[in-house]
Swiss-Prot record:
Mediates the induction of a number of unlinked genes involved in purine utilization. Binds to the consensus sequence 5'-TCGGNNNNNNCCGA-3'. Gene3D superfamilies: Zn(2)-C6 fungal-type DNA-binding domain. It comes from the Eukaryota. Residues 67-94 bind DNA. This is Positive regulator of purine utilization. Residues 832-859, 930-952 have a biased composition (Low complexity). InterPro entries: Transcription_factor_dom_fun (IPR007219), Yeast_MetPath_Reg (IPR052202), Zn2-C6_fun-type_DNA-bd_sf (IPR036864), Zn2Cys6_DnaBD (IPR001138). It holds the Pfam family Fungal_trans. Residues 1-15, 272-282, 811-831 have a biased composition (Polar residues). Residues 170-182, 189-207, 260-269, 367-377 have a biased composition (Basic and acidic residues). Residues 1-48, 163-207, 251-282, 367-391, 811-862, 877-969 are annotated as: Disordered. The keyword Signal does not apply. GO terms for cellular component: nucleus. It comes from Emericella nidulans (strain FGSC A4 / ATCC 38163 / CBS 112.46 / NRRL 194 / M139).
Length: 1060
């Protein structure tokens, strides 16, 4: 047995490489093999006694760990090898325990590996096979390895130098063996990496150097294969795709036998995923996160075809990344060869498609379907549990990622397309990121894909070589008469070019769709402007008519799944126009209101290109509304589609686009309207007066929000809502828009009954509740939406009520005069900056005086800090007099007013659901009601004239009849704090020069005095706040879009599905 107290020390090569010593027994020279690394003569310390302190000083970095038996019994382990004394007496195995992989491991990797190497070397010697003797460090070999040289197979350096080809006598096939996993140098490196933090850091630096070296080498590759010689970037695309691989490869373990959670709702804790206490910025978009997830076994042929069918029936019709015929040929080739002969390219593409297809299966009671013996109709097939061999989508994703590096690092195949296939691989990864949170986040994966597509020049197309022969110089000849040169291309070459061009178009518009979809969801700018795109749509024909020899003419009326894809492409173009115009208007307004400086170098008179040809913003908006309706009415029929993709989701996308079109077209407060300088002819109603169409805007927003929620409810009842993360996002956005319109518009309240409002709220919360076990962030969204809906209904019942009782005549009469005056004043005289600031100070003083004279108003406390796990302001909230949990039904007011209709006193379940809204002011009295502000609305972002931008507190009050005039799209009542008005600072004071946020952060309990805000990641007005801290804002979707801890946790259940 080995004894650590042995005075005669002999070190292993690993110990020398690490700079630390581990005692070994002295072996007789006759018994030790000459090639055994542990028997090599290595230099001893000059002073033998100097080695003893070295052992003691390295005890904290020992390579031997306590055994699992002593750990479980909480006994002190003597750490003897190969067995400790306790295990030796008990006669049991003495093994260690890995807390990350949750499995038993050898107590000493070094001892275990050295013993194994010695045994294998002895086998080689017994069979007369020569091999290189191991040395402590081969500098020449290491330089070649780090430089990325291919191993010279069959050379004298042997397996330590690279890859060798071992001939199989039975099938005469070459088996490639990786040097770093099987060679002694790789074993030594692996053991040092696991046991030494310093060596681990050095290894990470080495990996980074390798990627950087690869990027540098690829940057020198000559330009080949691009349609336009002006794009001189990396034509292979590896420099971009490897960034994605570096981020996502850490999501899978190195050993496929390691198992992760078996059930969808079991998630690893932060300590297991390695993301505790880190943010997206800390980990460089998740590059340092290393969660463990097992790899799925390669499915049998029947299961593979069913998973692929699910992908092509439900996912590919929306974003047609993959050519179906080409993919099925790849599947046939893969299953026709031996497992060892399958290429990394085929294994990656097949596994990532299996991952997406497995997520489409939505089932709760698969056993019942099997017991009843239902036939496999399309709907039954989707809900059917495939077999016991079915793995989770994350596990198929893990199996795909382990092959991504080999696929990207190998040369293009004879039947492949090099960089185009690498872009296709990234797009498939983005498609899976729609299904599950994946590091580094959907936003960053799509960004990499867009930049790779632009790098390949896919956005630019001029028809050269196929449609424009006059622009091509290949194979030109002049005739005798000196006529214009003509291009001669044979049919085979033309067919090949048509195939490649359609492939490029397909990938570009898939990348474009991803970019527009994600950017519109999160409210970020696009990766490329529409004005820079000249690429046409791909062919609308079914894939079987698009061959490598050319495009075949399809029969008249032949169905094609691309009808859905084309319809989605058109929608993304419309969404792109809407988002571009709204962001342009917001930026123009911010530049006009902001301090001078950079704007002196900008063209402030330039309007959005999409507004050219329209006399006003409203005319453009009406035109877009008309085009959206035409898009909805021109949706393809199921007979045209030819797949099982439910077309009801197209209508859902229409109403979501309507919300997007109108959510920032809401009115400015009356007091700000007369302080803004006259707008140009083309301006957003958010920055001018919109009294002529205000009711229409609110009504459209409310109708669209209600439609989205009800359609999701209907789809959920038939098990079609499987994109759980996007569904959570869309339902929450639609619900907020619906409540917002009710809060601010008596006209909307007059068109709705309390039962209709209650049904819509119940539909949203019920779907979110059902999605919770598949999408954990849905719980926080549901809780927040429930609280906001209760506050909205309570406020409405205490003021105007719902239905015909709402007196619109009085509301409109009381506000028309003031608006007419404000509109006239705003258009009649231009205001200087000094005059505007003076009027703002005067109006702020008047509002302060009004608030001091008014009675205290109820505070809306949504308890949002409970949703986000931040309880630092719980004590403050408990003492602030916030509304508690109200269980009593709404008490009918006893005050009577013949001129003010109130809801009837009958009880119904809807009224029992909501608690009382305690309004201290009688409805008929002209007492002021609060003007609720959304402290970071687009109108106020960067505006020095905004009181809310300075204090985050509602600055003034108005009568109940004026509360339909909001400041901008948002949850303004969340930050309402009437007690903080007197703390408001004057806009002209020096203390307020930095526009610090005060009231809102305190009410949310997230660090008073800092502008953290609530970044829901939804692209709403809350998202326009400036983040002055290094802390990440709240993210209800747990890193779905932007990575972070939530993007690396495995096992969220089935979440992909039929509609995005």
């Amino acid at each position: 047995m080995l004894n650590p107290s042995t005075s005669d020390i002999h070190t292993s090569p690993t110990a020398v490489g690490n700079g630390r010593k581990r005692p070994h027994p002295i072996a007789d020279s006759g018994s030790a093999m000459p090639s055994d690394p542990s028997a090599q003569q290595l230099p001893h310390p000059a002073n033998e006694s100097a080695a003893i302190p070295s052992i003691a000083s390295s005890s904290s970095f020992r390579n031997v760990s306590a055994c699992n038996r002593c750990r479980q019994r909480k006994n002190r382990c003597d750490q003897r090898l190969p067995r400790c004394q306790a295990c030796e007496k008990a006669g049991v195995r003495c093994v260690g325990y890995d807390p990350i992989t949750k499995r038993e491991i050898p107590r000493s990797y070094v001892y275990f590996l050295e013993s194994r190497v010695a045994y294998l070397e002895k086998v080689l010697m017994d069979n007369g096979i020569e091999y290189n003797e191991a040395v402590a460090f081969d500098e020449e070999e290491a330089v070649k390895i780090e430089a990325g040289y291919e191993a010279y197979a069959g050379s004298a350096n042997g397996p330590a130098a690279g890859e060798i080809a071992a001939q199989d006598g039975s099938n005469d096939k070459s088996v490639r063996i990786k040097k770093e996993k099987n060679g002694p140098l790789g074993l030594e490196k692996a053991s040092r990496y696991d046991h030494d933090p310093e060596v681990k850091q050095d290894s990470d630096a080495e990996d980074g150097w390798r990627i950087q070296n690869l990027v540098s080498n690829i940057g020198m590759v000559s330009v080949q294969g691009t349609s336009d010689p002006r794009y001189l970037g990396s034509t292979s695309g590896i420099s971009f795709a490897r960034v994605v691989f570096a981020a996502v490869k850490s999501s899978v373990p190195g050993n496929s036998s390691e198992r992760g959670p078996s059930r969808p709702k079991e998630r690893l804790p932060h300590s297991a995923t390695g993301t505790e206490g880190s943010t997206t910025r800390d980990s460089f978009f998740g590059l340092q996160t290393r969660p463990m997830m097992k790899c799925a076994a390669f499915p049998d042929r029947e299961l593979a075809e069913r998973l692929a069918d699910l992908y092509f029936e439900h996912a590919n019709p929306q974003i047609p990344i993959v050519h179906r015929v080409d993919f099925m040929e790849l599947l046939d080739r893969t299953y026709s060869v031996d497992e060892k002969s399958r290429s990394p390219r085929s294994l990656y593409f097949l596994n990532i498609v299996f991952a997406i297809g497995s997520g489409i299966i939505f089932e709760d009671k698969p056993a019942e379907d099997q017991k009843e013996g239902r036939d496999h109709s399309p709907s039954a097939t989707k809900r059917q549990r495939l077999s016991s061999r079915q793995y989770q989508p994350e596990e198929y994703h893990a199996s795909a990622i382990v092959h991504l590096e080999s696929f990207l690092s190998t040369s293009p195949t004879t039947d492949g397309f090099g960089a185009l296939e690498e872009l296709q691989a990234v797009l498939l990864l983005a498609s899976f990121a729609l299904l599950r949170p994946v590091a580094p986040g959907l936003w960053y994966i799509v960004g990499v894909a867009m930049r790779l597509a632009v790098d390949l020049g896919l956005h630019y197309e001029d028809g050269a070589g196929i449609d424009g022969p006059e622009n091509d110089n290949m194979n030109r000849t002049n005739n005798k008469d000196g006529e214009k040169a003509k291009l001669r291309i044979d049919d085979h070459e033309r067919g090949r070019r048509e195939w490649v061009r359609d492939f490029r178009r397909r990938l570009w518009w898939c990348c474009y769709s991803f970019d527009r979809l994600v950017s519109c969801c999160v409210g970020r700018p696009f990766g490329i402007s529409d004005q820079a795109i000249s690429t046409e749509f791909p062919s609308i024909l079914e894939d079987k008519y698009i061959t490598k020899s050319g495009i075949i003419k399809a029969p008249e009326g032949a169905p094609s799944y691309k009808h859905s894809a084309f319809h989605y492409f058109k929608l993304r173009v419309l969404q792109s126009e809407i988002q571009d115009v709204l962001q342009h208007q917001q930026a123009r307004f911010a530049r006009q209101r902001g301090p001078p400086g950079a704007r002196s170098f900008m063209r402030l008179d330039v309007v959005s290109p999409f507004l050219q040809g329209f006399d006003s913003f409203r005319s453009w908006r009406r035109d877009v509304d008309r085009r959206l309706l035409e898009w909805k009415n021109s949706a393809p029929m199921p007979s045209e589609n030819g797949v099982r993709f439910p077309l009801e989701f197209l209508e859902l996308n229409y109403w979501q686009a309507v919300i997007m079109l109108y959510q920032q077209s809401l009115t400015v407060p009356a007091e700000l309207a007369d302080e803004l300088s006259p707008a140009e002819d083309v301006s957003s109603p958010s920055f001018s007066q919109v009294e002529e169409d205000e009711h229409d805007i609110y009504y459209k927003v409310a109708e669209a929000g209600q439609k989205v929620i009800r359609i999701y409810r209907q789809m959920h009842r038939v098990r079609l809502v499987n994109y759980t993360y996007l569904a959570t996002h869309h339902i929450f956005m639609a619900g907020i828009s619906f409540l917002y319109a009710i809060w601010h518009s008596p006209y909307v309240r007059s068109r709705l009954t309390l039962d209709e409002v209650d049904f819509t709220v119940l539909a949203a919360t019920s779907v979110l509740r059902d999605l919770m076990h598949k999408c954990p962030p849905a719980e926080a969204c549901r809780d927040a939406f429930e609280r906001m809906s209760k506050a909205t209904v309570e406020m409405s019942l205490s003021t105007t009520g719902f239905g015909p009782q709402v007196e619109l005549n009085r509301v409109q009469t009381s506000t028309s005069g003031s608006r007419q005056f404000n509109a006239t004043q705003s258009r009649s005289r231009p205001y200087s900056r000094q005059q505007a600031e003076q009027r703002q100070r005067q109006s702020a003083s008047r509002r302060q005086l009004q608030m001091r004279q008014s009675r205290p108003l109820p505070r809306f406390d949504m308890n949002l800090e409970d949703l986000f796990g931040d309880n630092r302001a719980v004590a403050e909230r408990q003492g602030s007099g916030g509304m508690g949990k109200l269980a009593q039904p709404y008490p009918v007011s006893e005050t009577s007013d013949p001129n003010f209709a109130r809801p009837q006193s009958h009880r119904n379940p809807s009224m029992e659901y909501y608690g009382p809204f305690e309004n201290p002011v009688s409805p008929q009295q002209p007492q002021p009601q609060p003007r609720y502000y959304y402290n970071n609305s687009p109108q106020q972002s960067g505006s020095p004239g905004s009181v809310v931008a300075a204090s985050g507190i509602p600055p003034y009050q108005v009568t109940p009849t004026e509360q339909e005039n909001p400041s901008g799209m948002g949850l303004d009542y969340l930050d309402y704090d009437p007690t903080g008005i007197e703390r408001q600072l004057s806009l002209g004071s020096e203390e307020n020069s930095d526009f610090k946020f005060q009231g809102g952060a305190q009410s949310l309990g997230h660090g008073a005095g800092h502008n953290f805000g609530i970044d829901l990641g939804f692209g709403m007005a809350v998202d326009f706040q400036h983040d002055w801290s290094e802390n990440a804002n709240y993210d209800l979707l747990e890193g779905y879009f932007f990575g972070g801890a939530g993007a690396t946790g495995p096992g969220h259940g089935h979440g992909h599905g039929s509609g995005i």
